[in-house]
Amino acid sequence: MKNEQYMLKLVLTDHWFDEIKSGRKIHEYREVKPFWVSRIYSCSKAYAEERIKRLNKEYDLVTTGNEYVEFQKAYRKNAEKMIFKIKKMSIRNGKYTDLHIDKWVFDIELGEKIR
């Protein structure tokens, strides 16, 4: 794919990969933690901690350089992969997501399947 620098890469368990592949799951969630902030915003973990403070207070809609998300089915050799356009990314409480946590989470809404 031409725009790999604009791609967020995520590894999923077989169950969640298959849910997305079937179209039953159109949102992927990641807890707002330094690790995920640094991956989503392509920044250092030190900067990520400062960014988290602002995210929780100032933002709902998330703007990043990521245009696509690539899902990999588990950690295995020659793992199946899918690429989707990111329709929208926002921050919400994770209580009513499939994470079921009362914390801030990134809500990655999937758009068109590219491959």
Spans of features found by a protein language model:
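Structured alpha/beta reader/binder surfaces that contact nucleic acids or chromatin modification marks
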Residues: 2-7, 11-115
